[in-house]
Regions:
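Short, ordered, surface-exposed loop/turn motifs in non-cytosolic proteins
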Residues: 19-35, 148-162
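Short, acidic Ser/Thr/Gly-rich low-complexity loop/linker segments typical of extracellular
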Residues: 34-65, 164-186
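Hydrophilic extracytoplasmic domains
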Residues: 222-282
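A short, solvent-exposed loop/turn motif at the edges and junctions
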Residues: 62-110, 187-236
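Beta-strand-rich domain onsets/edges
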Residues: 1-23, 97-139, 144-150, 169, ...
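Exposed beta-strand and adjacent loop surfaces of beta-rich binding modules
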Residues: 9-11, 26-28, 78, 138, ...
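Long, positively charged binding patches that form subdomain-scale interaction surfaces
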Residues: 130-213
């Protein structure tokens, strides 16, 4: 018996590193052919999965005999998915997709090094305007191109905390970057994850700190688009973060509980902190 059904060409969900959960509320997701043309707005169900139907170029393909080798005979096409958060929690971005895709969309542009806590979904990256929630660590920087003096738009900042947990942030069009993440759990403080945190007698949350090693990827994406391709951004070449304008490497930083870490290069002449963190492209 022929089984004709309407096939959803795209099902995708988005992962928030900071809250360690999938996010759908407030996101605007649009899908269209990579060659251009109109965009279809995807909708999210109760499961948090965004689906898009009626995509240009797939109207006929969406209806097929799903019991007769549909997926083995269907030809895919190149699409672009654009993601925007009007609330300003996450950076806008885009990513390519071959559609229709069977099952949940698999994002193939892996982070390098892999970020801690990445789940099955397309990652969201915090915008600098995002307010930090309780019990979340924040690392901020204003990234400046050491050669041109311009904003290092789209530069990737990778933080390795206490030699183990790795988290990633991306600079916006003005070079501003914020990494928002759960604090690492101190080995001698196993109940930090409780809500509210339970503090042992004689202990203080504010006393905890972690060493942070920072690295960058930066290849001067120009002109910087409204919806930067996430795969292209994360595949930028390794760059050098400078401790000062003379070219000294950036030293290890310290993240303290309850205090945002703002990373800056140093003025060689005065020894005072500059308003920016210098990054040198390869």
């Amino acid at each position: 018996m022929e089984s004709v059904a309407r096939v959803g060409p795209l099902g995708v969900r988005f992962w928030d590193f900071a809250e360690e959960r999938f996010v759908a509320d407030g996101l605007i997701v649009r899908v269209g052919l990579a060659s251009g043309g109109s965009r279809i707005t995807a909708t999210a169900g109760e499961s948090g999965i965004f689906t898009a139907r009626g995509l240009p170029g797939l109207n006929v393909i969406e209806f097929g005999d799903t019991a007769a080798g549909y997926w083995s005979t269907t030809t895919t096409k190149s699409y672009v998915v654009e993601v925007h958060d009007p609330a300003g929690r996450f950076l806008p971005f885009s990513f390519p997709a071959r559609l229709p895709a069977r099952g949940l969309f698999v994002w193939t542009c892996a982070l390098s090094p892999p970020s801690s806590g990445l789940s099955d979904g397309v990652p969201l990256f915090s915008a600098p305007s995002r307010p930090a929630a309780s019990m979340r660590g924040v690392i901020r920087a204003q990234l400046q191109d050491a050669a041109t003096g311009g904003d290092a738009a789209g530069a990737v900042l990778v933080a390795t905390i206490a030699g183990s947990a790795t988290v990633t942030g991306i600079a916006d069009a003005r070079g501003r970057v914020a990494i928002v993440m759960p604090y690492p759990e101190p080995s001698d403080f196993p109940i930090i994850g409780s809500s509210p945190p339970v503090v042992p007698v004689g202990s203080s949350l504010a006393a905890y700190s972690w060493p942070v090693t920072l690295a960058a990827q930066y290849g001067r994406i120009t002109p910087y688009p409204p919806y930067p391709d996430l795969c292209t951004t994360l595949r930028q070449p390794g760059a050098t973060l400078l401790g000062d304008a003379s070219g000294s490497p950036l030293p290890t930083q310290t993240l303290r509980m309850g205090v945002e870490l703002v990373v800056r290069s140093v003025d060689v002449a005065t020894g005072s902190a500059l308003p920016v963190l210098l990054v040198r492209a390869p």
